[in-house]
């Protein structure tokens, strides 16, 4: 069976209409359109592929997998069906099969740039920088000089500690466009990671000339000039964690066997076995503490700068409210004597100096309340 008809295609119009309807969120209409297409062509892999995309958009992940696996079964060598399955696997944090499927489709369609983009995205989601670099190099053989591919390659090389090669790529991009802010910032980060802050100073000056007052550029400028700012800018952390939100639990809990939320939750429940308390979870992230606590007889309030992380936490349905603000503002603006427990797990590394944090936490705790926080040990 072929996924695409060689001559007149009796269902092409249906497929195009259904794809548009899915994109607009018109899922009932899309289902009706796909039913019409299937009546004309019962075993067309394209129908099942679109049905999978529709099911995922409707929140039916199981149905999405069933439809996409049916699509692949009908057309095992059809690239688009395989790619959509691989992308779904990656979005659901099933990285091993996602990577295997992505590599398969890359071999089937080595010159397809849409496939290349999907494969690189899967590699990044799975934390496989080496895989991403390999496919980015292949992409640059297909489209030499592509700016976006070079930016991604340089960033991945920097992440792998291959600073010299990363700098070569950044240098080439900046020579081509001296006002390329993404490349300038990339070179700054690479020079800082390579232990050459003084060499990054000129680039931070250029960045601040291009975007005066930018807090992220000002932060890196301070580092390049040998000054450690008291706090990281909120915008920097928001961008970082928005990008990590969908894969955070997979990497921390399953990959790194992260146990701190459970340890703290156990301590809280040991002191409050009836669960009658109010908890303020600062830097709540994807809601791991809430998952370990479960529903409590009181308020569980989550605070995080990342909207995407809060979206993940909301799915657990254990938090009563969320506030998308930074930790310092949350503490400063909260009235006193409200919470039995405040938690701040693995967030102080991002907020920096604690001179304001600890007194404000003490102020809003009830008498005899508990403040659980963690710090990282570092070499002298």
Where are the regions a protein language model picked out?
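Class I SAM-dependent methyltransferase SAM/SAH-binding core
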Residues: 280, 286-331
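Structural signature of tandem alpha-helical TPR/SEL1-like repeats
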Residues: 23-33, 58-70, 92-104, 126-138, ...
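Conserved beta-strand signature within the Rossmann-like core of class I S-adenosyl-L-methionine
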Residues: 368-375
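A short acidic, Gly/Pro-enriched loop at the edge of an enzyme's catalytic core
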Residues: 332-342
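A short SAM/SAH-binding and catalytic strip from SAM-dependent methyltransferases
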Residues: 340-354
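A short glycine-rich, Lys/Arg-flanked "PGG" loop and its adjoining helix->strand segment in the class I
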Residues: 355-367
């Amino acid at each position: 069976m072929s996924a695409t008809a060689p001559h007149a295609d009796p269902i092409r119009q249906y497929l195009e209409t259904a794809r548009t309807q899915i994109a607009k969120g018109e899922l009932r209409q899309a289902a009706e359109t796909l039913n019409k297409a299937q009546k004309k062509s019962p075993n067309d892999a394209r129908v099942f592929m679109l049905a999978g995309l529709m099911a995922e958009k409707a929140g039916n992940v199981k149905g999405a997998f069933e439809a996409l696996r049916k699509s692949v079964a009908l057309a095992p060598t059809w690239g688009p069906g395989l790619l959509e399955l691989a992308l779904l696997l990656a979005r659901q944090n099933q990285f091993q099969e996602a990577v295997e499927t992505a590599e398969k489709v890359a071999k089937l369609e080595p010159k397809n740039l849409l496939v290349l983009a999907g494969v690189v995205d899967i590699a990044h989601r799975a934390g496989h920088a080496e895989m991403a670099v390999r496919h980015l190099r292949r992409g640059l053989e297909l489209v030499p000089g592509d700016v976006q591919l070079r930016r991604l390659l340089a960033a991945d090389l920097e992440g792998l500690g291959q600073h010299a090669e990363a700098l070569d790529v950044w240098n080439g991009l900046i020579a081509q466009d001296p006002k390329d802010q993404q490349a300038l910032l990339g070179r700054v980060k690479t020079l800082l990671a390579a232990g050459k802050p003084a060499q990054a100073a000129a680039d931070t000056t250029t960045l601040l000339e291009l975007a005066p007052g930018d807090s992220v550029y000002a932060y890196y400028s301070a580092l390049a000039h040998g000054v450690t700012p008291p706090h990281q800018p909120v915008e920097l952390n928001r961008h970082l964690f928005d990008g990590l939100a969908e894969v955070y639990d997979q990497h921390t809990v399953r990959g790194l066997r992260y146990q701190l939320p459970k340890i703290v939750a156990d301590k809280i429940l040991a002191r409050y076995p009836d669960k009658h308390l109010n908890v303020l979870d600062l830097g709540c992230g994807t809601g791991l503490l809430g998952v370990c606590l479960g529903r409590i007889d009181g308020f569980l309030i989550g605070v995080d700068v990342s909207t995407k992380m809060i979206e993940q936490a909301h799915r657990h349905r254990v938090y009563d409210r969320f506030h998308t603000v930074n930790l310092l503002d949350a503490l400063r603006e909260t009235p006193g004597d409200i919470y039995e427990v405040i938690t701040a797990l693995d967030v102080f590394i991002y907020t920096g100096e604690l001179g304001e944090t600890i007194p404000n936490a003490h102020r809003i705790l009830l008498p005899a309340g508990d403040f659980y926080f963690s710090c990282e040990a570092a070499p002298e």
